[in-house]
UniProtKB/Swiss-Prot annotation:
Allows the formation of correctly charged Asn-tRNA(Asn) or Gln-tRNA(Gln) through the transamidation of misacylated Asp-tRNA(Asn) or Glu-tRNA(Gln) in organisms which lack either or both of asparaginyl-tRNA or glutaminyl-tRNA synthetases. The reaction takes place in the presence of glutamine and ATP through an activated phospho-Asp-tRNA(Asn) or phospho-Glu-tRNA(Gln). One of its GO terms (molecular function) is glutaminyl-tRNA synthase (glutamine-hydrolyzing) activity. Its EC number is 6.3.5.-. Belongs to the GatB/GatE family. GatB subfamily. It comes from the Bacteria. This is Aspartyl/glutamyl-tRNA(Asn/Gln) amidotransferase subunit B. One of its GO terms (biological process) is glutaminyl-tRNAGln biosynthesis via transamidation.
Length: 484
């Protein structure tokens, strides 16, 4: 039987406010345990929550960016459950009336563009953190510690429709969402610090069946690689279970990266288990049109708009435009290079950034902001290819030297110091061709007999004689003339 995977994601995006969503405590990461939790966070008697305006504005900005409906009135609700790192005994979230409803997010899986519908985005507070490995009692018995620094940190939970059909598609969506929230400046995107965490709802069904299978939820995956592996494992587990005559249980599972498997955490609750009801300590969040308009006026150019502009203004393919707008820094870098080149050469800039620059950044695990070759310096290098000073092959060597800081990272200085200027004198190139032809009569005859590989062999020997500095285009043209 052929099976189809059905995936929906719930992403907890930590909003980049200086203080918590309902208290004035700092959200700074890495402070000593329990030093950033005040009376509200600790749920001390008499303390009352006060809504953080900055968190609401970031939610509005996200809603506008994805084309969702920003609710003029949304309500905070108490989500009731017991956990040691939840001092109040409930989490303040949103249930029936979220701050954002609907919206879409487009992204590429390989070179295929996909669009996923969003169900909602709602504001809520984070819980604290339980630490199980660092503590023990005097008797040596294991113990757990509670750090409430994270309790009350503002989150925007973004929920998709169950429309994704592969782990690769889910990861591509998550990457696109991560890029968007960082682009908007509403989240720092630091997955190691827990600023961007995904819950994956996974089920399987026979191909062609309309009804969904029983889903499981994989909690708090904070790596794109782990997200893909967790979904793949869980889908295989469910398929094998069903084919062996078993039944999938609705439950919450955790992904164990060391064993590359998911394991049961607890039975999956339904909404009624949490006994949601409006929080009596918080008034409804009322968002007037003037507030929405003010947020819209301050919006940056969105990735989708910039992609369309790159396609229209620079003639880039859709895939290239998408790759160059994964971050604002990358988009700005490309545009700075493209503007410094002659008209019609933007594709060459895109090729270099998506090729040599991206490969070197990945190898060194750096972001474009940390690239030692500036946009202006790269533009100078590409201009030397365009004006015939060096070949594309030599340019790669020059780029490596620029990256390493040779001659101050100046392309012209490196070309001069290494004597790399391309030979474009037709007389000098012609003389080299004559020497190679005279030394290789057998290869010449093979070419004249129709073997194209022979031509490539001759070109290679000419370039070797020129130490790679002959203009490749001129070599090809003059060689064809001499061979007749």
């Amino acid at each position: 039987m052929n099976w189809e995977i059905v995936i929906g994601l719930e992403t907890h995006t930590q909003l980049s406010t200086d203080s918590k969503i309902f208290s004035g405590s700092s959200t700074r990461f890495g402070a000593a345990p329990n030093t950033q939790a005040n009376a509200v966070d600790l749920a001390l008697p008499g303390s009352l929550p006060v809504m953080n305006r900055g968190a609401a504005e970031r939610a509005i900005l996200f809603g506008l960016a994805v084309g969702g409906k920003v609710a003029p009135r949304s309500v905070f609700a108490r989500k009731n459950y017991f956990y040691p790192d939840l001092p109040k005994g409930y989490q303040i979230s949103q249930y029936e009336l979220p701050v954002v409803e609907g919206g879409t997010l487009s992204f590429f899986v390989g070179e295929e563009e996909k669009t996923v519908n969003l169900t909602r985005a709602h504001l809520e507070e984070d819980a604290g953190k339980s630490l199980h490995d660092e503590f023990s009692l005097a008797s040596g018995a294991p113990a757990s510690g509670i750090d409430l620094n994270r309790a009350g940190t503002p989150l925007l939970e973004i929920v998709t429709e169950p429309e994704m059909r592969s782990a690769a598609e889910a990861v591509a969506y998550a990457r696109a969402l991560h890029s968007l929230v960082v682009w908007l400046g509403i989240c720092d995107g630091n997955m190691q610090e827990g600023s961007f965490r995904c819950d994956a709802n996974v089920s399987v069904r026979p191909v062609g069946q309309k009804e969904f299978g029983t889903r499981t939820e994989i909690k708090n995956v904070n790596s794109f690689r782990f997200l893909e592996r967790a979904i793949l494992f869980e889908a295989r587990r469910q398929i094998e279970l069903i084919e062996d005559g078993g039944t999938v249980v609705q439950e919450t599972r955790l992904y164990d990266a060391d064993r590359d498997e998911t394991r049961s955490m607890r039975s999956k609750e339904d909404a009624h288990d949490y006994r949601y009801f409006p929080d009596p300590d918080l008034p409804p969040l009322v968002i007037g049109q003037d507030w929405v308009d003010a947020v819209r006026a301050g919006m940056p150019e969105l990735p989708t708009a910039q992609r369309a502009r790159f396609e229209a203004d620079y003639g880039l393919p859709a895939y290239d435009a998408a790759q160059l707008t994964v971050s604002r820094a990358m988009a700005d870098y490309f545009e700075a290079v493209a503007r410094a080149l002659p008209a019609g050469q933007a594709k060459l800039a895109a090729n270099w950034i998506m090729g040599e620059v991206a490969a070197t950044l990945n190898r060194e695990e750096k972001d474009i902001d940390a690239a030692p070759v500036s946009a202006a310096a790269l533009a100078t290098l590409i201009n030397r290819i365009i004006d015939g000073t060096i070949s594309n092959k030599i340019a790669r060597d020059v780029f490596a030297a620029m990256w390493a800081g040779e001659n101050g990272g100046d392309a012209d200085a490196i070309i001069a110091a290494r004597g790399l200027k391309q030979i474009s004198d037709s007389g000098a190139i012609g003389a080299m061709i004559d020497e190679v032809l005279a030394a290789n009569p057998a290869i010449v005859e093979e070419y004249r007999a129709g073997k194209q590989k022979a031509f490539n062999s001759l070109v290679g020997q000419i370039m070797k004689a020129a130490k790679g500095k002959a203009n490749p285009q001129q070599v090809n043209e003059l060689l064809k003339e001499k061979l007749g």
